[in-house]
Amino acid sequence: MTAKLIDGKAIAASLRQQIAKRVAERSQQGLRTPGLAVILVGSDPASQVYVSHKRKDCEEVGFISQAYDLPADTTQAALTDLIDRLNEDAAVDGVLLQLPLPAHLDASLLLERIRPDKDVDGFHPYNVGRLAQRIPLLRPCTPKGIMTLLESTGVDLYGLDAVVVGASNIVGRPMAMELLLAGCTVTVTHRFTRDLAGHVGRADLVVVAAGKPGLVKGEWIKPGAIVIDVGINRQEDGKLVGDVVYETALPRAGWITPVPGGVGPMTRACLLENTLYAAETLHD
């Protein structure tokens, strides 16, 4: 048995087409164009690539994209003032602060400064709390994208044993809440979990977001399980690999996401989806 691939690039492209269609319909109806403001502090190469992709995505679907590229020595006060201005700007539906930030800046305070109805990354405690209370509003983009990928398989998630490897605020913790909402029985683990192999081996569904290449071995995977690999790690030879050993997981899994081309494109597409949702549901 070889796993079926969950093609994140194709699913994300379809989602972008749907969003672009809706933006065009809004224009025909005389409604305003959704707007996304993206703040980049410093010149981290990976962040610059991510931000350029997000701006390109905005152009593709017809959003208005506002770019704020700030020097690495930007102060906390200056960033706070910018966020406050964007919070009050009626043309802006979403404010995205690209992480990581330079060490002298307090990311938590800045993320909390973004108004919850413009927090299209879904990182604000208000939005995380809504998800925890089973009344999600703006959902964290990567877990939201993963749920869309899982829906594409047609597999009924209700009652499945799900294991999340990684407990970050951005992926692991909100992912566990999304899976609970879908009716899974969820175990949250991390790279220091005792008998990680045992936990993974019992799972019908595994979501790995630990940021450690090759952490989850293919032979750990339960035959037929769904494997979602959030990891994206660049090797010395330049090749991108996930947190799962793909080659040995492929013959055991029922479904699997590739790296690259799996989760990453969906994270970006869900940022657009959240921005459209904010425009139509929270701001119109």
UniProtKB/Swiss-Prot annotation:
Which keywords annotate this record?
Answer: Amino-acid biosynthesis, Histidine biosynthesis, Hydrolase, Methionine biosynthesis, Multifunctional enzyme, NADP, One-carbon metabolism, Oxidoreductase, Purine biosynthesis
In the UniProt record, what gene is named as encoding this protein? folD1
Disulfide feature: none
| Signal sequence annotation | none
Q: Does the keyword Oxidoreductase apply?
A: yes
Q: Name one GO biological process term.
A: tetrahydrofolate interconversion
Q: What name has this protein been given in UniProt?
A: Bifunctional protein FolD 1
Q: What GO cellular component term, any one, is given?
A: cytosol
On assembly, the entry states:
Homodimer.
The pathway entry for this protein reads as: One-carbon metabolism; tetrahydrofolate interconversion
Q: Which Gene3D superfamilies match?
A: Leucine Dehydrogenase, chain A, domain 1, NAD(P)-binding Rossmann-like Domain
State the Gene Ontology terms under molecular function: methenyltetrahydrofolate cyclohydrolase activity; methylenetetrahydrofolate dehydrogenase (NADP+) activity
- Matching CDD domains, A to Z? NAD_bind_m-THF_DH_Cyclohyd
Per its record, the protein catalyses:
(6R)-5,10-methylene-5,6,7,8-tetrahydrofolate + NADP(+) = (6R)-5,10-methenyltetrahydrofolate + NADPH; (6R)-5,10-methenyltetrahydrofolate + H2O = (6R)-10-formyltetrahydrofolate + H(+)
Instruction: State the protein's purpose.
Output: Catalyzes the oxidation of 5,10-methylenetetrahydrofolate to 5,10-methenyltetrahydrofolate and then the hydrolysis of 5,10-methenyltetrahydrofolate to 10-formyltetrahydrofolate.
Record bears the keyword Glycoprotein: no
InterPro entries in alphabetical order: Aminoacid_DH-like_N_sf (IPR046346), NAD(P)-bd_dom_sf (IPR036291), THF_DH/CycHdrlase (IPR000672), THF_DH/CycHdrlase_cat_dom (IPR020630), THF_DH/CycHdrlase_NAD-bd_dom (IPR020631)
UniProt record similarity statement? Belongs to the tetrahydrofolate dehydrogenase/cyclohydrolase family.
Superkingdom of the source species: Bacteria
Q: What PANTHER family does the record tag this protein with?
A: C-1-TETRAHYDROFOLATE SYNTHASE, CYTOPLASMIC, C-1-TETRAHYDROFOLATE SYNTHASE, CYTOPLASMIC-RELATED
Organism of origin is: Pseudomonas syringae pv. syringae (strain B728a)
Residues binding NADP(+), per UniProt: G166, A167, S168, I232
What Enzyme Commission number does this protein have? 1.5.1.5, 3.5.4.9
